[in-house]
Amino acid sequence: MGFSVEEARYLAANADQIAQVAPEVALTKTSVFADRAVLDRHFGDYARAVSVLIASQRAAAGKFPSHWLTDDAAVQQATPARVARVRAERIAAAGAAFVHDVTCSVGSEAPAFSAVGLDWLGSDLDLSLIHI
């Protein structure tokens, strides 16, 4: 489930606190009520968004750094880092100097393009993704 713009702003502003609390929640079927109590205590009305963020960050392994702000849809749609690296190398070898990813979501391919020396700009129609 995605985030509203308000939730995205909250998550960005509270990323450090979320990172500190994340190890306290397992986010399993058997821990759901205990996890929700922890998240409610720390984040109140934003507990659902924080839960989605933590679960999504954990699922992002192999696609982009786990500390990035993301949601479950962005993780599912993200290009795996190895695939992004090959794509970036091919585009650089073709002589491009600049890449504009018009549907970048959370920008999972940006590090690969940066690593091969290409300038990269990402945009997306989803305003909440722009905020995260």
Regions found by a protein language model. Give the residues of each.
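S-adenosyl-L-methionine
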Residues: 1-94
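Conserved SAM/SAH-binding beta-strand->alpha-helix loop
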Residues: 126-128
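Conserved small/polar residues in nucleotide/adenosyl-binding loops
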Residues: 130-132
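Conserved SAM-binding loop of SAM-dependent methyltransferases across substrates and taxa
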Residues: 106-118
